[in-house]
Amino acid sequence: MSGPLVAVTGATGFIGSVLLKSLLKGGWKVRALTRSPRVDDEFTQWIEGDLDNLNALRNLVKGVSAVVHCAGQVRGSSLEDFVHSNVEGTGNLVSASIQQDLPPRFLLISSLAARQPELSWYATSKRMAEQLVIDHSHIMPCTVFRPTAVYGPGDKEMSPLFRVTRLGILPMVGQPSMRFGLLHVNDLVAAILCWLSTRIPVHGVYELDDGKPGGYDSQSVAAIAQEVWKRRVYCIFLPALLVSLIANINLWSARLLNYSPMLTPGKVRELQHLDWVCDITPLTLALPNWQPRIGLRDALSQAI
């Protein structure tokens, strides 16, 4: 493959797959990490391996101009589960990158959860991964994106909620005063493309949502859903004690039966947190060509 290359992890996941399509459409050549064999083409080279495979990671980043690290673990039954993938895996990728004669610019797709690392094992691991990346910014240009909840066609986290909402029920955990940001996957990918295209590498940690002032709350989401789907939508706040009980049972069942749970006590604390609204001003200053363009009202009918 000739021409500028970008290395991508997580290219088979929700965000990574949308990014891959956009990169190819934009004329980039991509080298991507994959766990299972895939067929190369003129513009995409697949490197078989994972974040534990140091040789695969060296092959992934060899000669690339940029690394976009989308891969990460969102389910787990212990802090160690998350640290292994999100921290140690990131460390392996950083190590492979800084060993290059000309280290590439490096972008970590983290999570807004890292802003509150005390809430969950996931949030802790994301914050640790961020710090690891930033600690190497004197060797290679490093950037961290902290997107809020990302949704869009194909996502497995928000789409089920939207499907239930279409039936007239918006289930929530926490309090009516909670506020949160949302981000369409296309706007996140657009920010990544802008980051790649800057002549001078961008440094720092940046939050991303759709830019709605003050974010959303349960009532505003319900109102938008009513407008889009032309039916009444009722907000139902699930009892906190019941949700916590289910989360604890799920965690212990996961440890007993050896599966990776999504609903854990830490996830419940994330869901109950009062403020997940972003300030995107720093990123719009760093990337003047980026502005979020898709609000929930625009995307809800296609989000499921």
Q: Residue ranges of each PLM-predicted region?
A:
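N-terminal Rossmann NAD(P)H-binding glycine-rich loop of SDR-like oxidoreductase domains
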Residues: 6-26
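NAD(P)H-binding glycine-rich loop region in Rossmannoid oxidoreductase-like domains
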Residues: 38, 44, 48-88, 96, ...
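Conserved catalytic-site region of short-chain dehydrogenase/reductase
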Residues: 76, 112-121, 150-155
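Mid/C-terminal beta-alpha module of Rossmann-like enzyme folds, strongest
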Residues: 198-262, 294-304
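Conserved Rossmann-fold NAD(P)-dependent oxidoreductase catalytic core, especially the SDR/UDP-sugar
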Residues: 69, 88-127, 143
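Amphipathic terminal alpha-helices
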Residues: 5, 274-304
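Substrate-positioning beta->alpha
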Residues: 156-160, 174-197, 203-207, 217
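Conserved beta-loop-beta element that borders a ligand/cofactor-binding pocket
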Residues: 131-153
